[in-house]
């Protein structure tokens, strides 16, 4: 018993020593330390001494989450006290989460942020369907560097001045009209990073005009607006990275892209059918889009976009992708026969990644069921599985169904790295034939990478027996990450 009492006294004594040492620090330094603690722990420091009573109100960084408070009134009362616009201390970083309750306090709180020189602001409406409006003061914040908004409404301002804003992420944010978004972006003279996740009921045209923008990501997966023609217009000559995942927009206009830019495009051109008739009806839009992407060094193309480009190539000549040195394309096994035609347009390609959306169109259901059954048999040794799958795949007619009639220029002069991004046991004969095609026809190929799974390594090693045109070519087997 005496030992426990002494132990408590030692711990209490150590706490006093720590508090005394902290108290010797300046208020700004204490606030900086407190800003790294959860808000509940920050507030509890107010009971340490008279000096500490109000120090927590001056911390420069805060994460305020409505759900940690017992009720809405407590949450609002805390915020009203902390976001007092008469305080002179700065609020550098703030994350604010709130729910569907009346958010009339937002105006006064945000006005306080702006007055107290906010630098990084993250505001998220977590629950509810009402999109609360943000006040006009946010549009004229002279110190704001990063702005990230979720499920909110931006009103239409007459004037915007955000001279320091470099990062802006707008996730499911509602704009009253097209001009509001365009004015917001164009009024940020040093903006470098822009991310837009578009609402499902937003059918507007997004115009991004910026002389400073370097990174742009736009996601629009669906829409329920049928009386508009959504689109995307990008005029940002300094962009280094552009990712568009858009299943809705019918028009895409890209102006003056940098040649060293990297593009990641998942575009459907507003179509649900990717056959040649559908592509033909959008021919002029596709024709105006392709020259812009043909100028970039790095290009990643989704399966649907690849289909659109292929069917367009049957209607008109594709532009030459002379600057493209890195290509990542996703397709189905049944679409492999289209790949060489596109590679013909990339004469200087150095690196190629082919990712596969799994389909077993060429393999009968009986064969697939037999393979699945064997893979579930715990007592079957790896070699038995290898021998059976090899018999099904390598000795089927599939291995001869893929025929490339030509060798693109890039294989003879520039292609150095190829990766076939799929699990080996999901390969049918066509993918094996593709690996063989690259090995036998690439003059300066340095590395061909495949991804075997647990039972596929022995099977993949058979590819080592294929003839290699490039003497320096390495064959790499590695797990998919």
Curated annotation (Swiss-Prot):
Instruction: Give the FBD domain ranges.
Output: 401-452
- Which UniProt key words apply to this protein? Leucine-rich repeat, Repeat
InterPro entries, A to Z: F-box-like_dom_sf, F-box_AtFBL13-like, F-box_dom, FBD, FBL13/AtMIF1-like, LRR_dom_sf, LRR_FXL15/At3g58940/PEG3-like
What highest taxon heads this organism's lineage?
Answer: Eukaryota
**Repeat is among the record's keywords:** yes
SUPFAM superfamilies per the record? F-box domain, RNI-like
LRR repeat boundaries on the chain: 123-151, 173-198, 328-356
The record's annotation in SMART domains points to: FBD
- Answer yes or no on keyword Repeat: yes
Per its record, how is this protein called by name? Putative F-box/FBD/LRR-repeat protein At5g25850
Provenance organism:
Arabidopsis thaliana
